[in-house]
Structures are given as structure tokens and as C-alpha cells.
Amino acid sequence: LLIRIKNLCNKNIVIVPGGGSFADSIRDVYDKTKMSENLANKLALKSTELFAEYLKELDNDLCLIENPKNFTKEEICVWLPSKKLSQNNSFKNNWDSTSDSVAAWLANKIMAEGIIFIKSLKDFKSKNKLYYLQNKNILDKNISIYLSGYNGLIKIVGLNILKKLEKESSWKGFI
């Protein structure tokens, strides 16, 4: 997927990865121990950075970056959010904020042209209401806070993205 994105897109791309199984492990430890919710959420946010390191291992051309002001057009950047968000009171660091909220928060801050959420979906309606996506746990419960006032394009794609990207020579009509 990273290779296809690099070949098809001539825009700034910032990846905000989820924490995946790393975050799931933190939640499991939190549920089974006396770990504070504050620490658990902090570690879950850091787990996105572990996944970022894994992406970097898969594609050494990716740049890992902490400061959103340092994104470049020449590279696909993967944002490491824990330092910035731990210093920012406008982000709700709790279990209702996942990487969905992190991506929406960042998109709003940098006035991104669009956000693409890549989800493990097979079948998906082309238009959905936000509350429906939240109730189905497709998007997190806090995302509406960060999408408020956001004017960019929002797309949610599932497993079908790989098949579509194989056939496309550009992003037009796709995003």
C-alpha cells in the first residue's frame, strides 16, 4: 500500500498510524492491573509510534517526524504524536480518542486538504453519518470534537483499497 501511495500521489502525505496490537496490549494490561487510566492512555498513544517504527522498517524512505511544522512535500511522513499531544490541552487523551481522533486533530491543525481513514472493512456504504460510524466502532467516540470546523475531504476506505489502487493510475476519482 505504501508503494502504491508513493507512486500515485504528488501531494503531501502524513501517515497517522494506529497502535494496532501494541495498543491492544496496553488496554489488556490496563484492564488486568492497577495501571492508571492516564498512564494507559499515554502508553496507548506511544504505541502508535511503535507501529510507526515498524512502518519505517518496511519502507526506509518514510520519515518519522514529531513536529507537524516539519512535514515536507518530498517525503511521506509518519507523525509521532505523543510529545506534541502530551503538551496540548486541546486533545482529550482517553479511551474514546484513538488514532482516528489523532488524525482528525492533526488535519484540523495543519489545515489538511483531506483525511483518508483506512479501516478493516469489507462492505461499506458510500455515504454514512458520523454517529453511525461511531456507533459501529468504525470511528472513535471523540472524533467529532476534532472534525468540528474541519472543511477538508474525509474518506474512509476498507480492504477494497488495494484492488482499486491496482487499477488506478491516479488518485482522481478515488479520493
Predicted regions: what they are:
Residues L1-F174:
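Nucleotide/pyrophosphate-binding catalytic subdomain
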